[in-house]
Every structure is written in C-alpha cells, then in structure tokens.
Regions:
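N-terminal [4Fe-4S]-dependent radical SAM core
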Residues: 1-13, 58-60
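Canonical Radical SAM [4Fe-4S] cluster-binding loop centered on the CxxxCxxC motif
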Residues: 7-41, 119
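Conserved, mostly hydrophobic/aromatic
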Residues: 20, 46, 67, 101, ...
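Glycine-rich anion/phosphate-binding loops
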Residues: 37, 41-45, 104-111
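N-terminal juxtadomain amphipathic helix
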Residues: 37-39, 57-61
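A short, N-terminal amphipathic alpha-helix
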Residues: 46-58
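Radical SAM/AdoMet-radical enzyme domain recognition
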Residues: 62-63, 76-125
Length: 125
C-alpha cells in the first residue's frame, strides 16, 4: 500500500464513522443505524491504525484530518480530541492543518460544536 522510500509530500488522514441515527434511503455508503456505539473501542482501533500507518509514512507532512461517515458529528468530542492529538504526535503537521468533520445539523448542538472546536476541528461541512 505504501512505498517506504516515498517519504515526501503531503498526507491526509480519513476516519470513517459508519454510524447514523437512521439510514437515509438514498445513502449508498457503509453506514449503520446503531445507538449503542462503544466509542472507547473505536478509539482504540483508530489509534492502532494510526500507529501502523505512521511507520509507513515517516517524513510526510500531515495537512488534513477528515472525519466522514456516516454521521461523525455523533462521535464523542473526547474521541476526536484524542485522534487529533495523536496525529500531531505521530506526524509533522502543516501549519495550516485542516481538521474537517461532516455534520448533520439535526444531530449536533452548539455546545457539541464548541467541544469539537476545542478538540481541534476547524472545518465543518
């Protein structure tokens, strides 16, 4: 998947949160309507994957972290904060690092958006 000799250039990370409050009839993405998500278990899996890929991408500069889905705005802000913090530890980061999150306006309130901003999210779509 990665050429260890190709350690130049920018790098983007994508985190897929496959959960939604309900499955939209038009959606073809890998998503599931599930209320009881084990956030700690998902965080552990994301962090393990990050460790693996960090070894394969040494020397690359991280310029984007993207949370997509599903409905990633259903994630706990602490999970997002832990992922962003670990990404900053594992990779050199571009000064303008974009941390972007898809959000459904019906499933996120201002207080949660503020918590995501505190976690490092600087773009919501």
């Amino acid at each position: 998947m990665f050429d260890n000799n190709d350690n130049q250039g920018q790098l983007g990370l994508y985190f897929h949160w496959p959960f939604c409050l309900s499955k939209c009839p038009y959606c073809d993405f890998n998503t599931h309507a599930y209320e009881n998500v084990d956030h700690a278990r998902w965080l552990s899996a994301y962090l393990r994957a990050m460790e693996f890929y960090a070894e394969k991408t040494q020397g690359r500069v991280l310029d984007t972290v993207f949370f997509g889905g599903g409905t990633p705005s259903l994630m706990e802000p602490d999970v997002v904060a832990a992922i962003v913090a670990r990404a900053r530890e594992l990779w050199l980061c571009d000064d303008g690092l974009e941390v972007s999150m898809e959000a459904n306006p019906t499933s996120v309130e201002n207080s949660k958006l503020a918590a995501f901003a505190h976690a490092g999210v600087n773009r919501v779509s």
